[in-house]
């Protein structure tokens, strides 16, 4: 058994019916030109009947909500679904289906993940049929970057190569110590001593936190203004999608010497500013975003290795370049603490 890390437990304890703590990924694929009508059906059967047992973290089940243990009664039928949308299905129908599924809590009495293989999609304005993979996994098991890496590893590197194993049967590296169980040769007393020795570092971090409050780029939750977006969250989810060329984001990032994530935040900031202006409800103070920040330094594809930073979205600035630069200064300042 593995002891749940503090981060794992946090995601479990914060979860409510109206605030699910799972993450998801939607992947859209084009059928090969020579694919017959049963192409997706055969793919589904191949994934469902894989003889390779599920690997970590897909074989982990909660024990008393304190430990992870291997599920000895794993049943793929509880996790994998093959769905054919009613014809003629458009992208809006796919997004509606995923929105409904993403609103539902995962079952804590089995490994907390699902995979949906969805066929019968006609992409808007594009020729040919599409099919999709929708993955849903609890954040206590894995973070977004690790989840994306697992899915990428399960995909064929070329269009001509067949998929060999579903994502849940891939062998993953052992969890890093930050996410793992206490080593067997380590007693709770030794762990307590280690934590006690860490107290001076904690004190230094708290002192640095106080000093940094005088930095002009320092962001706190108390700086966030009230807005029409401050509403109680319901259990319903609504998914929308838009496609961009990644190269466009990279060109902007390179031109202004900022990160790709800064550009994404700037796009979100611009959209929020435009929406709030249209509603005549733009706050004078900038919105503050709660942004996940990866601490992953290796190529591992499991566990939670992340924290969160606060980012000034600079929605009070009309000039998009000034807005991007303000966002970059804010995120850079927040990241310095790690």
Identify the residue ranges that each predicted region occupies.
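Soluble acyl-CoA-dependent acyltransferase catalytic core bearing the H(X)4D motif
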Residues: 1-7, 26-36, 45-52, 57-338
């Amino acid at each position: 058994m593995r002891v749940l890390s503090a981060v794992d437990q946090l995601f479990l304890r914060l979860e409510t019916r109206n605030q699910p703590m799972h993450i998801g990924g939607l992947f859209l694929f084009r059928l090969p030109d020579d694919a017959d009508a049963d192409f997706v059906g055969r793919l589904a059967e191949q994934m469902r009947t894989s003889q390779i047992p599920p690997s970590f973290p897909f074989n982990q089940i909660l024990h008393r909500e304190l430990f992870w243990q291997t599920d000895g009664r794993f049943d793929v039928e509880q996790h994998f679904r093959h769905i054919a949308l009613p014809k003629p299905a458009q992208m809006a129908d796919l997004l509606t289906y995923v929105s409904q599924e993403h609103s539902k809590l995962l079952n804590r009495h089995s490994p907390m993940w699902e995979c949906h293989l969805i066929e019968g999609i006609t992409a808007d304005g594009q020729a040919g049929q599409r099919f999709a993979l929708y993955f849903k996994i609890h954040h206590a098991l894995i973070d977004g970057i690790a989840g994306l890496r697992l899915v990428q590893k399960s995909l064929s590197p070329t269009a001509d190569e067949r998929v060999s194993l579903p994502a849940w049967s891939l062998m993953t590296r052992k969890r890093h110590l930050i996410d793992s169980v206490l080593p067997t040769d380590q007693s709770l007393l030794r762990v307590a001593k280690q934590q006690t020795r860490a107290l001076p570092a904690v004190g230094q971090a708290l002192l640095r936190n106080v000093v940094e409050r005088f930095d002009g780029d320092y962001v706190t939750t108390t700086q966030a203004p009230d807005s029409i977006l401050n509403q109680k969250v319901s259990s319903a989810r609504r998914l929308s999608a838009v496609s961009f060329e990644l190269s466009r984001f990279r060109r902007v990032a390179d031109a202004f010497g900022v990160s790709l994530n800064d550009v994404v935040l700037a796009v979100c900031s611009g959209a929020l500013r435009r929406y709030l202006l249209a509603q005549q409800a733009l706050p004078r103070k900038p919105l503050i975003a709660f942004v996940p920040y990866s601490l992953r330094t290796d190529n591992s594809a499991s566990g939670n290795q992340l924290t969160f930073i606060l980012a000034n979205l600079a929605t009070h600035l009309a000039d998009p370049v000034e807005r991007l630069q303000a966002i970059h200064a804010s995120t850079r300042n927040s990241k310095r603490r790690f």
